[in-house]
Amino acid sequence: MERIKELRNLMSQSRTREILTRTTVDHMAIIKKYTSGRQEKNPSLRMKWMMAMKYPITADKKITEMIPERNEQGQTLWSKVNDAGSDRVMISPLAVTWWNRNGPVANTIHYPKIYKTYFEKVERLKHGTFGPVHFRNQVKIRRRVDINPGHADLSAKEAQDVIMEVVFPNEVGARILTSESQLTITKEKKEELQNCKISPLMVAYMLERELVRKTRFLPVAGGTSSVYIEVLHLTQGTCWEQMYTPGGEVRNDDVDQSLIIAARNIVRRAAVSADPLASLLEMCHSTQIGGTRMVDILRQNPTEEQAVGICKAAMGLRISSSFSFGGFTFKRTSGSSVKREEEVLTGNLQALKLTVHEGYEEFTMVGKRATAILKKATRRLIQLIVSGRDEQSIVEAIVVAMVFSQEDCMVKAVRGDLNFVNRANQRLNPMHQLLRHFQKDAKVLFLNWGIEHIDNVMGMIGILPDMTPSTEMSMRGVRVSKMGVDEYSNAERVVVSIDRFLRVRDQRGNVLLSPEEVSETQGTEKLTITYSSSLMWEINGPESVLINTYQWIIRNWETVKIQWSQNPTMLYNKMEFEPFQSLVPKAIRGQYSGFVRTLFQQMRDVLGTFDTTQIIKLLPFAAAPPKQSRMQFSSLTVNVRGSGMRILVRGNSPVFNYNKTTKRLTILGKDAGTLTEDPDEGTAGVESAVLRGFLILGKEDRRYGPALSINELSNLAKGEKANVLIGQGDVVLVMKRKRDSSILTDSQTATKRIRMAIN
């Protein structure tokens, strides 16, 4: 206080003021400090000092031709004195005002296009709704979040090439635009930015915002999609939160959300097929999300959800080195362990073979609604510090950690038999058996765990087996904390391997992901997901399977027909018939298959019994492993619309109806397409017309390769011979004529010769 009084006293004397404002600074150290290097040492002071001068700005000489010397008020706008050390002129801040009011107006058409991300942000905020502010403790955890709404998902390198191509098309340098998205964006932007006068550097900077995902490691308590992160400073503080609903969605959030749904559906479906890995790859390659190929999105999108991780691993991409258990992401932060097999007995005396991790390790566990720090030794939980949004979330985390610890008291808490199976009806591995058991009911586990007296530690509280908080007692080793545990910040990606059953392992053989870890949560995708793979026909229910199966046969009828007559086994094993089997009652599948296969064989053997409609109708039933029996069927049952419906072996039914006159097929009353070939016409019509220009030589001759369809005959060279499949399922040998003169007579001869060749 004394010092301040003294200073005030000094400043009131005019001499003091004069010394401070007038004397030159001549101390070398001070001069050095403020003049060495190009870096401004005190920017704010410099700015204030410059703006106090009359002409603080320098500009190119030609500005004097564009701006008057004085404004309307008669104030000078620029000095006739040149800037020291350059040939620029000194200008008053008033000149800027004059320019803004009276200067030339450029074409503004490009502004919304260049500053698209800003314009869109304003719209989102305008239409967003801010709710009440609540004061409460915020459990924030640092997560890697997307801070840039509305971006495409190009890698930095890809974006750089696009930007160079759009902004500096004539610059030298190799630019390879390969991906679909790169080419589309480049074309779009070049058109948008024709005759754009905005500085190229600004355009490049704004394009980068639009093309590349920018992530930061930020403390978040609520939503993590980019439209929430852009208002993070408005929605959560240290002790308050404000409710907010965004005024619009952005494609990048929609892509992330839809990708997770597609990946989950695909992994769930692949897990129950005969070859999970092959099926998964087939589905990833044939699926589109919002019109973009799923594999392209997987290559660029950094989302770290379990199902997405499995799909990436299958494609040979690197994924995060953390592993998943019970829906929590575990990251080992210290310690190490070795694995060994050990047999343990449950409380029900059931033997389980556990892979035990020996050694001291520490982990962070991060889930959707709870996080924890776990310290464990061999089959022993030393400490677990949990924080979560609500009691339920905390329970989930504790159960997962207790099972993960592999403690004996946990194994002994099992009541009843463990026989959980996955979607493919295979038994789960022991760790997941235990997990499922206690996720259903953790009462016994918590009661058997044991309790201990606790010390009073700031920010931590005990928790009892019935989940009531306590300051005196707690379950052994378990504490609840007010603070969240940060997600693992390091975004390192590691090379992984994946086995046939979709278990993903790191190079040390630790399982990081498996189908058991994929969430069962169902959601509605924001973008349209188009699954072209037959494996996904089931996703829209039994009717869709039925219609899709028959449509597939009709679309591919030409090749199906040849396989039907030449290589039926290969045809029956086609994966396109796999979904259909789920519609056929399990007990009778084999008999149906045996019956249909025998029927087909008779059609192949007995002339004139080939019937297109009937083959199409019955073909899917022949795909199941056949049981030999003498049973005959007049109708076959399929389970659709919640009950068994009948398909008549001969004739139409509501399930399968073929109209001979219109040649239209309707399945369950829905149009399923046209059959190209009418089964009941004699050979003469279609074949003789098509076989003009060919000579029929006789019966099939295997030396000339597999039978061609009539459409494929056009590829033959003159004089070349081939087997050809004709309407009634018969195969004959033909030769393409060397001359065209006798084509007219061919159609009559063809009819006769076909009959002879066959008989």
From Swiss-Prot:
Please indicate the residue ranges that the annotation assigns to the motif Nuclear localization signal: 736-739
Q: Answer yes or no on keyword Disulfide bond.
A: no
Q: Which SUPFAM superfamilies match?
A: PB2 C-terminal domain-like
Predominant cellular place of this UniProt entry's protein: virion
InterPro entries from the xrefs? Flu_PB2_2nd (IPR049110), Flu_PB2_6th (IPR049114), Flu_PB2_C (IPR049115), Flu_PB2_CAP-bd (IPR048298), Flu_PB2_middle (IPR049111), Flu_PB2_N (IPR049106), INV_PB2 (IPR001591), PB2_helical (IPR049113)
Name the UniProt key words of this record, in alphabetical order.
Cap snatching, Eukaryotic host gene expression shutoff by virus, Eukaryotic host transcription shutoff by virus, Host gene expression shutoff by virus, Host mitochondrion, Host nucleus, Host-virus interaction, Inhibition of host innate immune response by virus, Inhibition of host MAVS by virus, Inhibition of host RLR pathway by virus, Inhibition of host RNA polymerase II by virus, mRNA capping, mRNA processing, Viral immunoevasion, Viral transcription, Virion
One GO molecular function term? RNA binding
Q: Where is this site: Mammalian adaptation?
A: 627
Q: Which domain of life is it from?
A: Viruses
Can you say where in the cell this protein is located?
Virion; Host nucleus; Host mitochondrion
| Subunit | Influenza RNA polymerase is composed of three subunits: PB1, PB2 and PA. Interacts (via N-terminus) with PB1 (via C-terminus). Interacts with nucleoprotein NP (via N-terminus). Interacts (via N-terminus) with host MAVS (via N-terminus); this interaction inhibits host innate immune response.
| Role | Plays an essential role in transcription initiation and cap-stealing mechanism, in which cellular capped pre-mRNAs are used to generate primers for viral transcription. Recognizes and binds the 7-methylguanosine-containing cap of the target pre-RNA which is subsequently cleaved after 10-13 nucleotides by the viral protein PA. Plays a role in the initiation of the viral genome replication and modulates the activity of the ribonucleoprotein (RNP) complex.
Family designation: Belongs to the influenza viruses PB2 family.
Name of the protein this chain belongs to = Polymerase basic protein 2
Q: Please tell me the species this chain comes from.
A: Influenza A virus (strain A/USA:Texas/UR06-0195/2007 H1N1)
